[in-house]
Amino acid sequence: MATEGALSSTGYMLHHLTHNASGKMQSIIDFSVINYDTIFFSILMLVVSLWLLRRAAKNATSGVPGKFQCAVEMLVDMVEEQSKSIVHGDRTFIAPCALTVFVWVVLMNAIDLIPVDLLPAIAGLFGIHYLRPLPTADLNGTMGISIAVLLLSLYYGFKIKGAGGWFHELFSAPFGNHFLLWPFNCALNIIEYLAKTV
């Protein structure tokens, strides 16, 4: 602890911007480096979000809901309306997955409410010198989540609409089915897919 007090402001910032990682990152996004703190806190917040949603479902009553049940029901209604406007088929997997990802990301961002020095100081007691507890501050983590959501949306787009329906929508929406409009429709739909997920 005495050596931490001797850090300059630049050293302090560099210490707090360094992940507990398997190696040194060569670029801002480097998938060959594993950031252990990002993985640990992401999985921890996923378990907490699943536990919270399970607890809300288990304790739900048909009578007057409590504050927690009301908040979860509002989230469920919001996600259901969003999924209804986007997916016009079977939403039995998509809506719960979207709810889980939403709560998970909110909880990962909520870690930022914990004082910045508290968790690294606790980890330092156990010999962990670098700890960056906010998973969404790691571009590898956020890119991983967005790529997974993009792949899920493409998969379920194919599954619900079929290959023919998906490609027809890719080239004919929103400007029409004329062959001169196909490049514009395709470009706009690709931008839309990337904007929704990445």
Predicted region positions:
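Selective transmembrane helix interface/packing segments
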Residues: 1-198
